Amino acid sequence: MTTFLSLTTAAAVLTLARGSNALVRPGNVGKLPALGWNSWNAFGCDIDAAKIMTAANEVVNLGLKDLGYEYINIDDCWSVKSGRDASTQRMVPDPEKFPDGISGLADQIHDLGLKVGIYSSAGLTTCAGYPASLGYEDIDAQTFAEWGIDYLKYDNCGVPSNWTDAYTYCVPDPGSKSTNGTCPDNKNPAPAGYDWRTSLTAERYRRMRDALVSVDRTILYSLCNWGQADVNDWGNETGNSWRTTGDITPSWPRIAAIANENSFLMNYVDFWGYPDPDMLEVGNGNLTLAENRAHFALWAAMKSPLIIGTALDSISQDHLAILSNKILLKFHQDPVVGRPAHPYKWGYNPDWTFDPAHPAEYWSGASSVLGGTLVLMLNSEDTKQRRTAVWKEIPELKDVLGRQGKRRTGFRVTDVWTGKDLGCVRDHYSVELESHDVAALVVGRAC
């Protein structure tokens, strides 16, 4: 029998269930993975109110709001760098970057029917050296609530020595080729059975959770501690999503390495809790169109938060089409099925191989809204390759095939990228893929 511990305030309920710990918020905030935009990948520290409002307006004008994208998130470098207000101890928005303050900007974003996010860190300074929130959790949570903030990205920089963990957790990032990943150079591992919930890292993040729960506004809580301190074990009871790796970059080797690492964490994904492989790089750098497609499809299939990180006023139609794929977004936002797609076959490698250059290539996931099963086939290699989805290998299709017997071995198939009905496909579907491209299918009713 599942037991629950509830901490109730006017703003939120913290529900802890054995075996399925989750931070449950009012209004279903955080039940589904977040959709939005963030300033960092596009602009870094070079931000101001005009750039944030441009992004907000483009989310509306480009039709992204209608597809569910709702958060407009201000990342690092938004405050006065020299320190807090001496009398109130509050962080102060940079008046040159944000002449109407964060609250004035938030009002404008809310007027568009969107939500607004902000950034801080569980340390003394942010990653760019601005004031952060360790020791000021209650003041900052109250300030964010008063400003109308709806989302907090909480980083892991500026941690003082007295808040450093006693042990070092193994995050094989980028890792080396080995089964499940190892950290052979870790000189300070925790003893067997160590509970990372007791770590100082977990405590730093709990303090902000408790502060956010206590304010009279529901603020989605996005942990960004890079997979440290076994956050997969306690992240769901602390926040709505939690970063699993270091930062992403707009390069295929980095995207592949993160996809590989995150692919081993799919059992942690369900309603109210999402391992986060970092923000999207679609539209950035020198990624090929195929790599942009594969990046987005994998992130959507894993039900990761989909936070756009490119300048929307200059986005190409090809990149916009990827971010706007209705089939992948429907799978991602399924109101009935919380579980993600899972790898069912590694393809290039033997199953369960940890290989940053070649993540799992064959994925499938159930859906209540697509009329079938989502299936992905990735070409992780550097040359054109053929990939084949065999129906009897796909977990969601095995029972159907068993009931049909030998009389019917086909399924109606739809191409996710084109929306084209591919007809009744018997036994398997085979396709030639460019380097680092992905085929995405909805495998529907038997035929």
From Swiss-Prot:
Catalysis: reaction(s): Hydrolysis of terminal, non-reducing alpha-D-galactose residues in alpha-D-galactosides, including galactose oligosaccharides, galactomannans and galactolipids
Gene3D superfamilies assigned: Aldolase class I, Golgi alpha-mannosidase II
EC primary class: hydrolase
GO CC aspect terms: extracellular region
Active site residues per record: D155, D247
Binding residues annotated for substrate, in chain numbering: N225, W226, G227, Q228, A229
Matching InterPro entries: Aldolase_TIM, Glyco_hydro_27, Glyco_hydro_27/36_CS, Glyco_hydro_b, Glycoside_hydrolase_SF, Melibiase_C
EC number: 3.2.1.22
Subcellular location: Secreted
Name of the protein this chain belongs to: Probable alpha-galactosidase B
Organism: Neosartorya fischeri (strain ATCC 1020 / DSM 3700 / CBS 544.65 / FGSC A1164 / JCM 1740 / NRRL 181 / WB 181) (Aspergillus fischerianus)
